[in-house]
Amino acid sequence: MKIGILSQFPQLYSTQRLVEACQSRGHEAVVINTLNCYMNINSIKPSIHYEGTELVGFDAIIPRIHASVTFYGCAVVRQFEMMGVYAANDSISIARSRDKLRALQLLSRKGIGMPVTGFANKPNDIPDLINMVGGAPLVIKLLEGTQGIGVVLAETKTAAESVIEAFLGLKANILVQEYIKESNGSDIRCFVVGDKVIASMKRQGPEGDFRSNLHLGGCGEVVKITAVERKMAIAAVKAMGLVVAGVDILRSNRGPLILEVNSAPGIEGIEQTTGISVTEPIVEYIEKMVAARKTNRPIIA
Ligand SMILES: Nc1ncnc2c1ncn2[C@@H]1O[C@H](COP(=O)(O)OP(=O)(O)OP(=O)(O)O)[C@@H](O)[C@H]1O
Ligand SMILES: [Mg+2]
Ligand SMILES: [Mg+2]
């Protein structure tokens, strides 16, 4: 197969590992810088051009769309879909999961547990909004933040009111969320491919930070997840329609709660913490899907 890896960063560990996994399973891997793709949208033969030539002959793509380029990245993935190329994460699912509000709304419809979350537009909604999620302390999040940036813990009602006012004054879209204190600055990251959790780790934030993101200095350790957590992670990925995803779960007093589903989950942290290759299963999954598409057999993966 010829597999395109959509990434702006060819030197990144994750990009390199995906290339290696494709090659070790006998496929051709091409790293494509998403932002350098330009598209010809027409009803006869939609195409993508790249550095002066047309991209042809691809069987599948693995999108690694960075949060800062969601709009353009999804357009490129969608164009590949229009050309009949299999996308291991399609454009609709990436867009769904990237917007934390949309994602939580979809998860809530499936009855998947999550911290109580509020969303508002007008500043005069603030006191009731704060009460709705159980009062302070509470967490305030930018809708499209990532790597823990734009996730704030407001310890008091006054702090919460001023942070919410400031964000809304800047026209930022924010979520207001119940703070799960008992998770103690840690969460569980499950790496899912298809309908399987391939690897999981517990992430613990640095001393004094409630955020567990590895990019902010958190560290990972191997963890055994429960059957309920496994089921929940898989259901969340299915609700998004993703095939490759990183699911963040908080362990709360009322059981596991989903925080979010990431469509371009980090690969370095989970592989180094667990010693499990998560890239091989991605390529294996793509092989099954592409083969099933060709023969029109029902897809069992
Ligand atoms: N409601 C909450 N209660 C307790 N801790 C929370 C809550 N929300 C977020 N956190 C902590 O903050 C971290 C970052 O939050 P979240 O995953 O929502 O943001 P992110 O910026 O999208 O991160 P990622 O890099 O995983 O995409 C979480 O991993 C968790 O440790
Ligand atoms: Mg995220
Ligand atoms: Mg997260």
Swiss-Prot record:
Pfam families: RimK, Rimk_N. Keywords: ATP-binding, Ligase, Magnesium, Manganese, Metal-binding, Nucleotide-binding, Protein biosynthesis. Binds 2 magnesium or manganese ions per subunit. Mg(2+) 1 binds at residues 248, 260. GO terms for molecular function: ATP binding; metal ion binding; ribosomal S6-glutamic acid ligase activity. Mn(2+) 2 binds at residues 260, 262. Residues 104-287 form the ATP-grasp domain. InterPro entries: ATP-grasp, ATP-grasp_RimK-type, ATP_grasp_subdomain_1, RimK, Rimk_N, Rp_bS6_RimK/Lys_biosynth_LsyX. One of its GO terms (cellular component) is cytoplasm. Mg(2+) 2 binds at residues 260, 262. Signal peptide: none annotated. Its EC number is 6.3.2.-. Its cofactor is Mg(2+); Mn(2+). Mn(2+) 1 binds at residues 248, 260. Transmembrane segments: none annotated. One of its GO terms (biological process) is SOS response. It is an enzyme of class 6 (ligase). The keyword Cell wall biogenesis/degradation does not apply. ATP binds at residues 141, 178-179, 187, 211-213. HAMAP family: RimK (MF_01552). Belongs to the RimK family. PANTHER family: RIBOSOMAL PROTEIN BS6--L-GLUTAMATE LIGASE, RIBOSOMAL PROTEIN S6 MODIFICATION PROTEIN. This is Probable alpha-L-glutamate ligase 1. It comes from Shewanella baltica (strain OS155 / ATCC BAA-1091). The gene is rimK1.
